[in-house]
Every structure is written in C-alpha cells, then in structure tokens.
Amino acid sequence: MTNEQQNKDEQYMRKALSEAQQAFDEGEIPIGAIIVCKDRIIARAHNLTETLCDVTAHAEMQAITMAANELGGKYLTDCTLYVTVEPCPMCAGAIGWAQVPRIVYGAADPKRGFQEYAPRVLHPKAECIGGILEEECRQLMQEFFKSRR
C-alpha cells in the first residue's frame, strides 16, 4: 500500500470513528461505517440496534442501504467500505452481495468477526485490509463495554 493510500485510509477511518463516537454517545455499541465512491463519501452510519430494536441495524448494513439509495442501485462496485470493527458474518454477507471491492476495518473481532467464521463470504476479488487506526477503534469499544459492566 502506498503512503498516499495509507493516509487516505486513515483519513476516512477517522470519519468512521466519528460515527462510532456518535453511537457511543447514544448508548449504542460504538461501531461506525462510511462508504466512499470515487473519493466522495456517499454514506455515513453507526449502529442503531438499540434505537431501532433491530438486531440487523449494524453500521455496515445502514451504510450499504444509504449508499445503494444514493447511487440508485444495489451494487457498490466502485466503492470502499470503512468500518471501525471487523464486520460480523451477517454484514460481510451483505458486503459480498453488494459487491463492495474494498473493505477497510480498524479493530479485529476474533469473537464475532467474519474472518474467523465466514472468511469466504466476501466477493472473491474483494480486498480486505485490517488494522487501520486499530488502537483507537479498539479503545472506543473497550471504553464502551467497561462502562457497561
């Protein structure tokens, strides 16, 4: 990965972290996601599972729906998804169905992340990069769960 791409990924991950902070402030599990298409943010979302009483209202699912509406179609073939925590198998399935070619996440999720349970669910040509601003993403999650215990 070039320095320019690394800088871009960090810049967009900071936007996803901003969404995660908003979720934290609302009492939601602090995961944020953004979708970028041709260097333009077309969707911003965070977890809404508590607010909507909907177990499927994950940040990635919300962002995919917004992006599809923005682009007028269900395939996000020119997009990159940035999410603060590794997607779960459900979200990874939706990412695969939407044909997102590039996924960038912050903190790994060894307990519920797709790489452990469903590593082949993404489109076969999809590029998946983890560890971008990993410590910041992990700290926000740890702070949230620490405050709940």
Task: Locate each region found by the language model.
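Zinc-dependent deaminase
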Residues: 1-25, 87-149
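Small-residue (primarily alanine) positions within well-ordered alpha-helices
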Residues: 16, 20-23, 33, 43, ...
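Short, basic and Ser/Thr-rich N-terminal targeting/leader segments
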Residues: 27-31, 77
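Short beta-strand scaffold segments in enzyme catalytic cores
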Residues: 31-39
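Short beta->alpha transition motifs characteristic of CBS
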Residues: 42-49, 125
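Residues that line or immediately flank small-molecule/substrate-binding pockets and catalytic motifs
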Residues: 49, 83, 107
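A short, polar/charged loop-to-alpha-helix boundary motif
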Residues: 51-61
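Immediate flanking context of iron-sulfur cluster ligation sites
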Residues: 73-85
